[in-house]
């Protein structure tokens, strides 16, 4: 492991973010899928359209139980001779069990990858990637492994231990730091993730998957589709994921409860998905909340008042 090479980067709220960082993503992992039936098998399991996914594209998706509750949220892309599903490590053993449940009937091999995952962030990261790849696509194969675009300021590199020495020798321009900076970019882009504390609790729309092209409403049947479709066409979904800011004494964790104001009282309002705490206590968090709250609703976490921050996208699914 390369963890000692990636120290903590201490940032305050008003600090400018580094324009090029590289981090080892120890809290993330890949499920890989190979075999003759991989496409048809995965198509019948997940919310996104696997069949139409081009070789050089990446998409968000979710894997649900029969009632439409999410086991995982992932980003899917082609890798080596199959597919890779990039997702949170804490929930990956549960997800592996669930995604393999019907695999015995198909020619497909599903496993957790032991590849090294590196996160490239910042405006200059793409410049470096452009210099070391022969493509301008969102998924690129290079001598170091597979690069996949996670957001406008985040790229994932799936690599192997034998490549790290040469790779590190070429990263003198980058700030090497721990993966908290990756989390900060992820939160600023309001990208959902699913840790084990949130497994099997929410439907995809509660984490905004429809807003980031993570649900296909035109594909054929998949597990949980009936609930997901009802949420769209009958309006049964009552939750969404929002971006909040406030002051915290300690880093909030996935699954933490956040309160909301009801008149002069407080009651449980929602659940933290992810959070980043700056050194000065200012904190950004993604939280699942009711989607019909009044504009003047206040929020409370760790005895501090929090407020909504505008999302970088709309919650429509068109």
UniProtKB/Swiss-Prot annotation:
One of its GO terms (cellular component) is cytoplasm. GO terms for molecular function: folic acid binding. Disulfide bonds: none annotated. SUPFAM superfamilies: Aminomethyltransferase beta-barrel domain (SSF101790), Folate-binding domain (SSF103025). It is found in: Cytoplasm. Folate binds at residues 28, 182. InterPro entries: GcvT/YgfZ_C, tRNA-modifying_YgfZ, YgfZ/GcvT, YgfZ/GcvT_CS, YgfZ_barrel. GO terms for biological process: iron-sulfur cluster assembly; RNA modification; tRNA processing. Keywords: Cytoplasm, Folate-binding, tRNA processing. NCBIfam families: PRK09559.1, ygfZ_signature. Belongs to the tRNA-modifying YgfZ family. PANTHER family: TRANSFERASE CAF17, MITOCHONDRIAL-RELATED (PTHR22602:SF0). Folate-binding protein involved in regulating the level of ATP-DnaA and in the modification of some tRNAs. It is probably a key factor in regulatory networks that act via tRNA modification, such as initiation of chromosomal replication. This is tRNA-modifying protein YgfZ. It comes from Aliivibrio fischeri (strain MJ11).
């Amino acid at each position: 492991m390369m963890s000692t090479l990636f120290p903590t980067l201490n940032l305050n709220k008003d600090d400018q973010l580094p324009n090029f960082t590289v981090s080892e993503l120890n809290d993330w992992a890949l499920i890989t899928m190979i075999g003759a039936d991989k496409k048809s098998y995965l198509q019948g399991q997940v919310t996104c359209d696997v069949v139409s996914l081009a070789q050089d594209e990446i998409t968000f998706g979710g894997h649900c139980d029969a009632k439409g509750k999410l086991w995982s949220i992932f980003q899917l892309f082609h890798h080596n001779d199959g597919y890779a599903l990039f997702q949170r490590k804490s929930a990956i053993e549960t997800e592996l069990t669930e995604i393999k449940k019907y695999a015995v009937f198909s020619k497909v091999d599903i496993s957790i990858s032991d590849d090294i995952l590196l996160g490239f962030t910042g405006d200059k990261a793409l410049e470096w990637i452009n210099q070391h790849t022969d493509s301008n696509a969102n998924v690129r194969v290079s001598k170091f492994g597979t690069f996949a675009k996670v957001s406008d300021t985040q790229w994932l590199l799936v690599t192997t231990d034998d490549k790290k020495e040469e790779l590190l020798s070429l990263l003198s321009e980058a700030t090497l730091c721990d993966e908290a900076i990756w989390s900060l970019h992820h939160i600023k882009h309001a990208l959902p993730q699913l840790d084990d504390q949130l497994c099997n609790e929410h439907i995809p729309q509660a984490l905004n998957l429809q807003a980031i092209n993570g649900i296909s409403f035109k594909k054929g049947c998949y597990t949980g589709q009936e609930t997901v479709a009802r949420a769209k066409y009958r309006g049964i979904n009552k939750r969404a994921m929002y971006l909040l800011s406030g002051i915290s004494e300690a880093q909030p964790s996935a699954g933490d409860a956040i309160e909301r104001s009801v008149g002069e009282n407080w009651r449980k309002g929602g659940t933290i998905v992810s959070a980043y705490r700056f050194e000065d206590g200012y904190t950004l968090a993604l939280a699942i909340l009711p989607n019909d709250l009044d504009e003047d609703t206040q929020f409370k976490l760790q005895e501090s008042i929090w407020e909504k921050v505008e999302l970088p996208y709309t919650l429509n699914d068109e």
